[in-house]
Amino acid sequence: NLEQEINALHCELKEKIYQPAPLKQFIIRDPKTREIHASAFRDRVAYHAIVNVLEPIYEKKFIYDSYASRKEKGTHKSIERYDSFQLRVSKNGQLINKPDTNNNIVGYALKADIRHYFASVDHEVLLSILRRTIKDEHVVWLIKKILDNFETEINGKGMPLGNLTSQFFANVYLNELDYFVKHHLRAKYYLRYVDDFVILHQNKKTVESYHERIICFLKSLNLELHPDKTKIIPLRNGLTFLGYRNFHYHRLLRKSNVRTYKKKILREQELMKKGLLSQEEIMQHLQGWFGYAQWANTYRLRQEIMKKCGLKKPSSLDA
């Protein structure tokens, strides 16, 4: 009985006897291998309730250019914002005229990734950040219960991928970095999506200074930048961000993403020949991928894939 379950959950929370159920672990490969942990349904009800209360409070604190797990934000808004930033990186901050060649494009970007971010979140640091805003210790107790329910090799560290609370707390934690970059470094062209972030500036030495100071600041959060995924890149070379290779006046898909999807299509065609997959199911998969691909210059690529599949052209191909 749903009403009885909700009442029981309410009593457990009120009496501080609530204990989340063990997380269910499973692996996804699409294409990167990730370990996902799913909460029980009744726990998800509690987690949604706490996020529904805290989210409006923290939305007022989050910077504009944080794009993950927020209403009216997301991947595509982030890419659009990046486009506007790179068009404005010039000495006087005005729009750059369309260049004849990429060599005419000025500016640099610090493209950075935080190493093992979700596994590295320090519970005590997170709770101290939350306590600045949350004065109700009952709420803090519940948050601690949620954090402690995720068992890791290092006690007091890490959040599970797949939980709504993890996505929300990930933004709260890195809001510290956002404020440091915007208010201490005074970086004008900065945006973040989860643990990936970009800072643009015309001057390379300024970008190098940002890099060094961010490395020092992240120590206060017990975090570090990923050495292989953090680079300073001339904007004329294009920047790979959120699955796209972004240039000033065009955008491409990452080559690895295209290769992976073409292999997937070949596998699905074999399954269709064996009667294990219908044409309608393949079409659904294609429509989902086209939704991602149409944000880049991929018209010919989408035509090629449709031709290989022997399928009619979908409306999304026209975009």
Regions found by a protein language model. Name each.
Residues 47, 51, 55, 72, ...:
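Well-ordered mid-protein domain cores that form the structural environment of catalytic cofactors
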Residues 5-8, 12-16, 20, 65, ...:
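Conserved polymerase palm-domain catalytic core
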Residues 27-29, 59-62, 108, 152-153, ...:
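Short acidic (Asp/Glu) and glycine-rich catalytic loops that position anionic groups and cofactors
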Residues 20-45, 61-74, 149-171:
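Short, conserved non-catalytic motifs in the polymerase core
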Residues 39, 48, 208-209, 225-319:
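Right-hand nucleic-acid polymerase module
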Residues 54-61, 297-300:
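Short helix-capping/linker segments at secondary-structure and domain boundaries
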Residues 13, 17, 30-32, 42, ...:
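Generic hydrophobic/packing signal
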Residues 1-7, 318-319:
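Non-catalytic, polymerase-adjacent accessory regions of viral genome-replication enzymes
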